[in-house]
């Protein structure tokens, strides 16, 4: 064989090396996803063992399927399982939304909180509570709080969150803003909505202000089964949409120039992803209240572990978000038991140190 005709494929075993390396790459990513899934299931079962009625893990599993002691089945299916499912669905939705924001804006700081979506929801909820106070939505844990009907509050919170998204998208289209400018615009809107919430509270009665503050605490236990079904539906639709756009997100991650050369409408993908991500995040915030750091930290951590391949980053972020919210919910119940701490405070206490560590680790590199 002539020297000029020798190729890698003609050498024994050489043609298989890249293929084997790629297969190993895929296996490692899939193995991590399996580990994350098993961890989430384990945390969920452990979470349902805790409470005033201590239940063994095996009994929890049987109770989920309606088997075992009547009291145990009632405690698991009526109280603990809905709360755990709410934590999983909310964690998945917020993490997927954060992953999508960080992808299309190419900014690791993009999340529902930094884009003003959480603050817009708080403003909408404040209006609902103060305008329609006196309904049947008072919490049993806070006697004397005057609040609006939960459905009305959720609708106003959703409207406020989507208002922030619409303003960002409209202004970014008018001025052709860069992804960095969009995040800065979100920070400005956060301050604006926070100021609006403060002014609304200033003119409210004490009981109404207490209701607004209680709503912003965040609470997974106040989500009804019908609200959980709505959250789950929105989350599933959003997940399908994001996964269908995984290759476009990979292309944008490699550079907008490359994405354009592949025939991808970067602005169109950015618009669609932001709308779907905002719908998912807004739905969760409307029903659960403010839940900080899940949409920021979970995708950021998984990006450090897995890289920016959205075929694996999306499901990994979803599982990490579910796990983070489950762990936070457990801490809510055990830190100062029998009191239950606000979920937003615990997610911040859990997420902020992790994020600071990742930032310092990145700087040291």
PLM regions: where:
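Alpha-helical transmembrane segments in inner-membrane proteins
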Residues: 2-365
